């Protein structure tokens, strides 16, 4: 099938676009998924759908609270965080009977709403009495990438006077550079860690407290109670750090699926609670469609099938390029969401694609050369708004023309001229167009990718909701740290031992 020219598939089927595109309505806006510039055909799609015919039960099981995270014996209920009935109740519409899990979600959303109101009114003050208006999120992985990406993507909706910063790296430079930009008297720090024992997060929180002590001249307990908020499921551990304001996390929500919860507190404070709710509503709309539609009408399944097809035909990576400055960090968010979810042992042998990417049109002047003429097989995914959030029509037209030119150029190539001037074409692209970047459409796109990841995991026989690979590096890092601090005397490979020796020489 890979020998078939994509452009010939268009020539032989006038209805190809209709058959291989899906449109998802999100309130007044929409998202358009175009899989037609791939090698997919209806026959290929139907072949995969036949293998997925029992996935409906698995999908219902997730929404119903079955323990589909089988390695940890946990429910997978990030969908409950944006449950339609929960959101209706938060807005004061009706009083549905919620199950225990969704009742906890509702209670926490109301708690977030109240805190945002206190923040807006100036009732959240620091040790000097100044209103806190600078939000600093301290977390790593899912406690950082999701909120960081959303705050960046929704910059157009950010509220005047509210600033957001993110600290994740254990390299102290990350924290120090943030402190160089902020007024510590007006800064609120949100420490996000489910266990509240994540090394990078806790050490960064401790460094932030130490720097605040120096700058504000107050003791740590007062600083912690006034300038810090925790998001965690381990209240006892939070208490050891004198942080009194605690928001909940639950075992049924994994970090990379958690931005819809109090993990997204930085989002709610930055864009306001109403816009945070709009984000959740967009995701909720996709949840409804995903659960209701099966087979060819399920956009997430078709998206998964495209990736499965190329994975089984020798592709090992996917390049995501967003032609939208606001979406610059989207591929980084998906990098974790996809690779941590499906980059593990598989019953079928295959695992998820390597995810990388960048920002259009910048990337056209960096790595697109390889995409057009390189020997590596790359599945390219392009995202683009149909309406911009600015009034400069000329510039948006240039963005659109570049995005469409790349997808067409990768497909048709150029056969004339010398070998150096020739482009073989027949390179697949998936194009995702959204009518306009709003909280709803962003939420809908994130939910779409979450569900696509789930479908891929089901097909490969992977539990997409645990992350055992994270623990090995942590264990070895602890051993090396003990050696550095003269608390251990382990034998290492010659390479590691030599680098440790060099480190010792530099410290003398």
Swiss-Prot record:
It catalyses: alpha-D-glucose 6-phosphate = beta-D-fructose 6-phosphate. The active site is at residues 340, 365, 474. Pathway: Carbohydrate degradation; glycolysis; D-glyceraldehyde 3-phosphate and glycerone phosphate from D-glucose: step 2/4. Gene3D superfamilies: 1.10.1390.10, Glucose-6-phosphate isomerase like protein, domain 1. SUPFAM superfamilies: SIS domain. InterPro entries: G6P_Isomerase (IPR001672), G6P_Isomerase_C (IPR023096), Phosphoglucose_isomerase_CS (IPR018189), SIS_dom_sf (IPR046348), SIS_PGI_1 (IPR035476), SIS_PGI_2 (IPR035482). PROSITE patterns: P_GLUCOSE_ISOMERASE_1, P_GLUCOSE_ISOMERASE_2, P_GLUCOSE_ISOMERASE_3. GO terms for biological process: gluconeogenesis; glucose 6-phosphate metabolic process; glycolytic process. It is found in: Cytoplasm, Cytosol. Its EC number is 5.3.1.9. D-glucose 6-phosphate binds at residues 142-143, 193-198, 336, 340, 365, 474. CDD domains: SIS_PGI_1, SIS_PGI_2. Disulfide bonds: none annotated. One of its GO terms (cellular component) is cytosol. Belongs to the GPI family. Homodimer. In the cytoplasm, catalyzes the conversion of glucose-6-phosphate to fructose-6-phosphate, the second step in glycolysis, and the reverse reaction during gluconeogenesis. This is Probable glucose-6-phosphate isomerase.
């Amino acid at each position: 099938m890979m020998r078939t020219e994509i452009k010939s598939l268009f020539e032989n089927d006038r209805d190809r676009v209709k058959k291989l595109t899906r449109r998802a309505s999100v309130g007044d806006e929409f998202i358009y998924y175009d899989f037609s510039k791939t090698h997919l055909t209806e026959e290929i799609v139907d072949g995969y759908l036949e293998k997925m015919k029992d996935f409906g039960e698995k999908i219902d099981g997730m929404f119903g609270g079955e323990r589909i995270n089988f390695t940890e014996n946990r429910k997978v209920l990030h969908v409950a965080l944006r449950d339609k009935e929960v959101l209706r109740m938060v807005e004061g519409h009706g009083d549905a009977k919620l199950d225990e899990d969704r009742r906890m979600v509702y209670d926490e959303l109301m708690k977030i709403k109240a805190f945002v109101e206190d923040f807006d009114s100036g009732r959240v003050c620091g040790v000097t009495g100044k209103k806190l208006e600078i939000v600093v999120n301290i977390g790593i992985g899912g406690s950082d990438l999701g909120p960081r990406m959303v705050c960046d993507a929704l910059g157009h909706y950010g509220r005047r006077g509210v600033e957001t910063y993110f600290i994740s790296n254990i390299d102290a430079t990350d924290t120090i550079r943030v402190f160089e930009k902020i007024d510590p008297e007006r800064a609120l720090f949100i420490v996000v860690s489910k266990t509240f024992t994540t090394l990078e997060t806790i050490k960064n929180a401790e460094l932030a407290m130490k720097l605040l002590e120096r700058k504000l001249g107050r003791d740590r307990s007062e600083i912690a109670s006034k300038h810090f908020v925790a998001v965690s499921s381990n209240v006892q551990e939070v208490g050891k750090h004198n942080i009194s304001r605690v928001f909940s996390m639950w075992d049924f929500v994994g970090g990379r699926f958690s931005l819809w919860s109090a993990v997204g507190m930085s989002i709610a404070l930055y864009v306001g609670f109403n816009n945070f709710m709009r984000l959740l509503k967009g995701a909720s709309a996709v949840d409804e469609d995903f659960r209701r539609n099966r087979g060819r009408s399920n956009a997430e399944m078709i998206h998964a099938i495209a990736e499965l097809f190329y994975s089984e035909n020798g592709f090992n990576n996917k390049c995501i390029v967003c032609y939208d400055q606001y979406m610059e960090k989207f591929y980084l968010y998906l990098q974790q969401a996809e690779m941590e979810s499906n980059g593990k042992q598989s019953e079928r042998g295959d695992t998820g694609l390597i995810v990388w990417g960048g920002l259009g049109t910048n990337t056209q002047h960096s790595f697109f050369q390889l995409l057009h003429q390189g020997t590596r097989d790359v599945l390219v995914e392009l995202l683009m708004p149909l309406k911009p959030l600015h009034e400069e029509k000329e510039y948006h037209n240039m963005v659109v023309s570049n995005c469409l030119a790349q997808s067409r150029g990768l497909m048709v190539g150029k056969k004339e001229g010398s070998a150096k001037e020739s482009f073989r074409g027949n390179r697949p692209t998936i194009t995702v167009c959204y009518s306009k970047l709003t909280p709803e459409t962003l939420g809908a796109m994130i939910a779409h990718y979450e569900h696509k990841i789930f479908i891929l995991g089901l097909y490969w026989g992977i539990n997409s909701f645990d992350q055992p690979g994270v623990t090995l590096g942590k264990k070895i890092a602890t051993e090396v740290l003990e050696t550095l601090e003269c608390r251990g005397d382990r034998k290492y490979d010659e390479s590691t031992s030599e680098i440790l020796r060099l480190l010792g020489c530099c410290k003398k």
